[in-house]
UniProtKB/Swiss-Prot annotation:
GO biological process, one term: viral process
Predominant location category: host cell
Protein name: Non-structural glycoprotein 4
UniProt note: domains: Binds 1 calcium ion per tetramer.
Residue stretches spanning the membrane: 29-51
Record GO cellular component, one term: extracellular region
Residues noted as binding Ca(2+) in the record, renumbered to the chain: 120, 123
PTM comment text: The N-glycosyl content is primarily Man(9)GlcNAc, with a small amount of Man(8)GlcNAc.
The organism's taxonomic lineage, starting at the top: Viruses, Riboviria, Orthornavirae, Duplornaviricota, Resentoviricetes
Topological relation to the membrane, as annotated: Single-pass type III membrane protein
Subunit structure and binding partners: Homotetramer. Interacts with the immature particle in the viroplasm. Interacts with host CAV1, early and late in infection. Interacts with host integrin ITGA1/ITGB1 heterodimer. Interacts with host integrin ITGA2/ITGB1 heterodimer. Interaction with microtubules blocks trafficking to the Golgi apparatus.
């Protein structure tokens, strides 16, 4: 494990890769060299980056399984993104977090809907009561004799049929 962080070991691996690539290039039918070189570079970089991180994580963490799972998922997601895919892997914990978040939002929306329907029902009941109070009821006569002084006013029967309502009467006032 100490070889992983050693500079000579790293240079030896790079030299081995270069020799391998030069041997492959000598063959006349090799046209995929840039793709092979890119893939080997990515794999080597991931190898150099992930092993020391995993070594450190195994020493310091008690839950090494979760760390390894998280590192593997991250590496696979990196490879998928480098390959041009928009899909990605999620571990079970992340999926459960997303499900819990969605369920929480649904519960909040349901409580809001319940509150709104309760308010709407109360408003409809209030409008019904207001309508009932405003409806004119024709079943009972309102006695207006106490409201105005009926002695000072002539009724239609008092005017009689021979007199026109538009006829003026002479008013004489003292000067």
């Amino acid at each position: 494990m100490e070889k992983l962080a050693d500079l000579n070991y790293t240079l030896g691996v790079i030299t081995l890769l270069n020799d391998t690539l030069h041997n492959i290039l000598e063959e006349p039918g090799m046209v995929y060299f840039p793709y092979v070189a890119s893939a080997l570079t990515v794999l080597f970089t991931m190898h150099k980056a992930s092993l020391p991180a995993m070594k450190l994580a195994m020493r310091t963490s008690q839950c090494s399984y979760r760390i390894i799972k998280r590192v593997v998922v991250t590496l696979i997601n990196t490879l998928l993104r480098l390959g041009g895919y928009n899909d990605y892997l999620t571990d079970k914990d992340e999926t459960e977090k997303q499900i819990n978040r969605v369920v929480k939002e649904l519960r909040q929306q349901l409580t809001m809907i319940e509150k709104l329907t309760t308010r709407e029902i109360e408003q409809v009941e209030l409008l019904k009561r207001i309508y009932d109070m405003m409806v004119v009821r024709h079943d009972r006569e309102i006695d207006m004799s106490k409201e105005t002084n009926q002695k000072a006013f002539n009724t239609l029967h008092d005017w009689g049929n021979d007199r026109n309502y538009d006829d003026n009467t002479d008013v004489i006032a003292p000067l």
